[in-house]
């Protein structure tokens, strides 16, 4: 059992009051998944310069209490959180629609050094949890992307710096015949500016994917809210 912040005990799933308080459905941009006003399908940034993927969605904002829980999950301190994260993603209409309408899922990979340090690949676990909770889930294309190098820490960088930081970050291990014509979903735990998702999408489209959508459990809000 774990204790949810100020809300009581949980056992691999959120209680209804906590889900209502911290994972309330909200209107989001259909591409970058930032919060938008009701009735607005695309934020101003995406209307001006659209991402290279088709559709994007996130279940929650990267904020309290999710930020701390995601850190615990990624570090392997509390791997059981993946079940609850996947549950929120499969119950959120935006993320569920994208996840289920695909030929395959591609997870953002970890570098060997980072995987060795953590001993746990949170994206692989999250995709496994998602598959278990969907009736007819798409297949997971394991190893479709591989990291070419370790990117510098992204947290302190702005969007322009991040885009430069992820240049030649990934390669695909699949041939064009393996990916050609497929409708893919790239899955990550957190989308901060979308730079990492952009890099992954570019590689998959170049390899012949018909389309790429993206899903993250959490989306970092803009600094101004």
List where the protein language model places each region.
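Glycine-rich phosphate/pyrophosphate-handling loop used in enzymes and phosphotransfer proteins
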Residues: 1-225
